[in-house]
Regions:
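Non-heme di-metal
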Residues: 1-124
Length: 124
């Protein structure tokens, strides 16, 4: 089957978009924490934003490895949070999102990748 038609392709695209958006959210959370005087939390959010950027890069590299080149567009439908509150709210939202990824989304994506024959994508 053409990779571009697989669920793994869709999941990698969702993951790339999600990690990219998470990076931006964490960058904004850092600004908010700094504004509230929480320098340690601001640095923690900035470090987490950097981690999300690295994750996004890994997903993009897998898309480029398997997809037809150049990949001009991948259509998919997904929901992403658009929250920005005070630092305590941002911490709770971050924990909620990271838990959702770790407990549900990424294990399901990995299972699908293995089933479709993309073991290295499953290992992300």
């Amino acid at each position: 089957m053409d990779f571009m038609q697989t669920q793994t392709c869709q999941n990698l695209a969702r993951s790339f978009a999600g990690e990219s958006q998470a990076r931006q959210r964490y960058t904004q959370y850092a600004q908010q924490a700094r504004k509230e005087g929480f320098e340690y939390l601001a640095r923690l959010f900035e470090q987490t934003a950097g981690n999300e950027q690295a994750h996004a890069q890994e997903f993009l590299e897998k898309l480029q490895k398997y997809g037809r080149q150049p990949i001009e567009n991948i259509d998919f439908s997904a929901g992403y949070p658009y929250t920005l509150g005070v630092t305590m709210e941002n911490l709770l939202e971050a924990a909620k999102g990271e838990n959702e990824e770790a407990a549900r989304a990424y294990p399901a994506f990995a299972r699908t990748a293995r089933e479709e024959g993309y073991a290295d994508a499953a290992a992300l």
